[in-house]
């Protein structure tokens, strides 16, 4: 696996859980002997939904809700087979979406 890299993209609604997961991944990769760059914070997506408070009238009374999706990027350069095995065994919280590209 020389001159290869693993790119891991993490997404979550809660940034604290996301940062904990990123630290776990970085720590595991460094322990197995790989070079790690990251976690790199990517721009946060913000989805805003506007809803009328009243059912029939009062259009001026509105409520806004937002959903923020936080993202991080981790690059693992020159991973060893031990690194890949350790990452596969790693348990992360259910609120974190993980996308891995080899």
Swiss-Prot record:
The keyword Ribonucleoprotein applies. It holds the Pfam family Ribosomal_S10. GO terms for biological process: translation. InterPro entries: Ribosomal_uS10 (IPR001848), Ribosomal_uS10_CS (IPR018268), Ribosomal_uS10_dom (IPR027486), Ribosomal_uS10_dom_sf (IPR036838). One of its GO terms (cellular component) is ribosome. Coiled coil: none annotated. Keywords: Ribonucleoprotein, Ribosomal protein. It comes from the Bacteria. Gene3D superfamilies: Ribosomal protein S10 domain. Transmembrane segments: none annotated. Belongs to the universal ribosomal protein uS10 family. Involved in the binding of tRNA to the ribosomes. This is Small ribosomal subunit protein uS10. It comes from Exiguobacterium sibiricum (strain DSM 17290 / CCUG 55495 / CIP 109462 / JCM 13490 / 255-15). The gene is rpsJ.
């Amino acid at each position: 696996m020389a001159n290869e890299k693993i790119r891991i993209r993490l997404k979550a609604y809660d940034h604290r859980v996301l940062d904990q997961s990123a630290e776990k991944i970085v720590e595991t990769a460094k322990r197995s002997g790989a070079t790690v760059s990251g976690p790199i914070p990517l721009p946060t997506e913000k989805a805003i939904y506007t809803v009328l408070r009243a059912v029939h009238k009062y259009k001026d009374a509105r409520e806004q809700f937002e959903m923020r999706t936080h993202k991080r990027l981790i690059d693992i350069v020159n991973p060893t087979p031990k690194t890949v095995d350790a990452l596969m065994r790693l348990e992360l919280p259910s609120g974190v979406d993980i996308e891995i590209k080899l």
